Amino acid sequence: MRKRGILALCLGAMGALGAVVCVPPPPAGNTASFETEPLRPGIADPATALTFASTLIDDSPHLLLVVGYADAVARGIDLGAGADPFDTLQRLGRDALIGMARTEADRSADFPLARLLPAGQAARQVATGTNFREHAQEVAVERPFNFPKFGPPTPAVTTVLRGDGVLLDYEGEICARFDRPLAATEDFAAAVKGFFLCGDFTDRALLTRLVTEDVESGIGFSDAKSGPDFFPTGPFLVIPADWRAFVADERITTSVDGDPRQDARGAGMTLDFAALAEVMLKTGASPDWQYQGQQVPLIAAGVLPQGAALMSGTPAGVIYRPPDTREIVCGSVWHICTAGFLREGFRPAVIERFLGRLAAADVFLRPGQQVRHASSQLGEIIVEVR
């Protein structure tokens, strides 16, 4: 009798919850704010910022001074094989390169976006979470945080593989790299700063399984956001005369099959790159992060190597939303009333039920879709999902 009473109580509870709160909610709406004017990628005036790219010519990487960009084609002046943007700027000087861009454009040639090499260089970056207020609100995290991201940069025209069981999500970001290693805040202040467009793909299923209640610890993020094709980078490295003004005004967008998903400017960052560097250098040497089951530091030996990127974080408009109170309550009742506690723990059961509902909603990236990150002066990235 007692067992039948418990069963009846559970069935009644599930029925009531199902009628009131446990029906699958509609897909979460996009919380991003969108500018009315369409974004047309171009390049900065040379006096504002110098734009560089690289391409293979006779199987050797050549540096280009970019003098124009339209319709996924860059026009650039070949500065020679093996040249580095930062070294070239130091050797020739900003004024000479501005003059070259303005008076020697007849030396330029066309280079399709697909021929340009990645602006990123290193296989380990410092990534940033919830550094745009609207994005922090949509994923219910209060403050920005960092984590190491592993995996080589891929070019501006590329692919990303959605593996079995993966809930693949996009993020568009601004990345920075520097002309020297950063070991102290003085290094950041003295460094020449270059910026490029970048993407940050995420396996939301893996992240949901690994993340802890202390989201700002970054645990789970390195595993869910690292991989051979999870870091696409734009075609240009842009070195502005005034980096703060340039970043603040830079607009970045994301679309999926032409549907707008993200739209923001760098001014929306909670922490600018100087503040991000300060936090990174203050805490980065401690092995407080996790990747593939091992404790790792944010930056090895407390130094961001030359070539490694510091990432801005993404604005609002991602697909994922964390489980809310309704989801947790419904999952808890289901776990108890189906005797799930005899098979697995409470948290895994609730998570797997939540992930199953997300997969059934079919809102995450699917093979055949195209993700496009675009920017006002950093170029664009076109990714085919496979």
Briefly describe each language-model feature range:
Residues 1-12:
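N-terminal Sec-pathway targeting helices
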Residues 12-145, 150-151, 157-158, 165, ...:
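N-terminal non-catalytic cap/leader segment that marks the start of a structured domain
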Residues 32-38, 123-293, 334-352, 360-362:
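Glycine-enriched loop-and-adjacent helix/strand subsegments that border the catalytic/binding cleft
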Residues 184, 318-325, 358-361, 378-386:
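Short, Lys/Arg- and Gly-enriched loop/turn segments at beta-strand edges
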Residues 288-301, 326:
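Short helix/loop segment immediately N-terminal to the Walker
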Residues 302-304, 365:
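Short, well-ordered loop/turn sites that connect or cap secondary structure elements
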Residues 306-308, 368:
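Loop/turn positions that initiate beta-strands
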